[in-house]
Amino acid sequence: MPRKKLVGTVVSNKMDKTVVVRVERTFAHPLYKKTVKRAKKYHAHDEDNSCGIGDIVEIEECRPLSKTKKFKVVRIVKKSVFGEEKLETPENVEMLGGEEK
């Protein structure tokens, strides 16, 4: 039986070597035929801690790695700029010892 492959968005990377991936699926309602969206969260193994919040990743089913972790990150499809900080913002300059008088 082939392994499931899913594509989703990383919503949390606070755990060590683990990310939470939100996978959305759409389907037609059986009675009303309206397109409905449903989402499910999966814990996935990220060996290098390389995923950030907002990244779009591909995950693949694997052997159980823990009680809730049964997927691993295969590749990062698209990196997000959501989590990046720029050091030039006024708040960061003040925290770094900023302005000379």
Swiss-Prot record:
Cross-referenced InterPro entries: NA-bd_OB-fold (IPR012340), Ribosomal_uS17 (IPR000266), Ribosomal_uS17_bact/chlr (IPR019984), Ribosomal_uS17_CS (IPR019979)
GO molecular-function term, one example from the UniProt record: structural constituent of ribosome
GO biological process: one example: translation
Listed PROSITE patterns: RIBOSOMAL_S17
Name of a matching Pfam family: Ribosomal_S17
CDD domains assigned to the protein according to its UniProt record, in alphabetical order: Ribosomal_uS17 (cd00364)
Keyword Membrane attached: no
Superkingdom of this protein's organism: Bacteria
Disulfide bonds: none
Similarity comment: Belongs to the universal ribosomal protein uS17 family.
Quaternary context: Part of the 30S ribosomal subunit.
Protein purpose: One of the primary rRNA binding proteins, it binds specifically to the 5'-end of 16S ribosomal RNA.
HAMAP family reported in the protein's UniProt record: Ribosomal_uS17_B (MF_01345_B)
UniProt name for this protein: Small ribosomal subunit protein uS17
Annotated source species: Kosmotoga olearia (strain ATCC BAA-1733 / DSM 21960 / TBF 19.5.1)
Gene name tied to this protein: rpsQ
